[in-house]
Amino acid sequence: ILDLGCGSGRDSKFFIGRGFDVTPVDGSEEMCIRAEKYIGHKVRRLMFEDLDYDGVFDGVWACASLLHVKKEEMNETLRKVSKSLRPDGVLYLSFRYGDDERRSSGMIYSDYTEDTLDTIINNDAHLRMIEWWISEDTRRDHPDDLWINVICCRL
């Protein structure tokens, strides 16, 4: 599993604890250091635009990470993510639900709806959307936020 934008390493630790071979990556040096300490595993510093894997993963986990990609760059980013998967590999994505793109504290935040994601995913990314659902935010300070969760398969 490629944990793309692993952040603190929370999900990588979960997957490793269940016996999966995990490759955690993050674009932030600070988050890489934090994740390495938390999971006891090397974390590669890698920006989304520099993704360079070719058909090596059965799954890519991008939980609330690709929301930091500008909307104008999402098609190309998803092509690179798709390329990292083996044929029939599975991709999980999540984004805050909506249509906004904003900058806060130097970071980009891109929100998506199911229609927008369906268009992007079916736009030459060699992916097929299998399922999507909306979930509530579990953080207490964001009670009104909704998230869109998507599962795709590489063609």
Where are these regions (language model features)?
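Acceptor-substrate binding/catalytic loop of class I
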Residues: 93, 101-116, 139-140
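A short SAM/SAH-binding and catalytic strip from SAM-dependent methyltransferases
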Residues: 59-73
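A short acidic, Gly/Pro-enriched loop at the edge of an enzyme's catalytic core
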Residues: 49-60
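Conserved class I S-adenosyl-L-methionine
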Residues: 1-5
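Conserved S-adenosyl-L-methionine
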Residues: 127-137
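Class I SAM-dependent methyltransferase SAM/SAH-binding core
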Residues: 8-50
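A short glycine-rich, Lys/Arg-flanked "PGG" loop and its adjoining helix->strand segment in the class I
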Residues: 75-87
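Conserved beta-strand signature within the Rossmann-like core of class I S-adenosyl-L-methionine
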Residues: 88-95
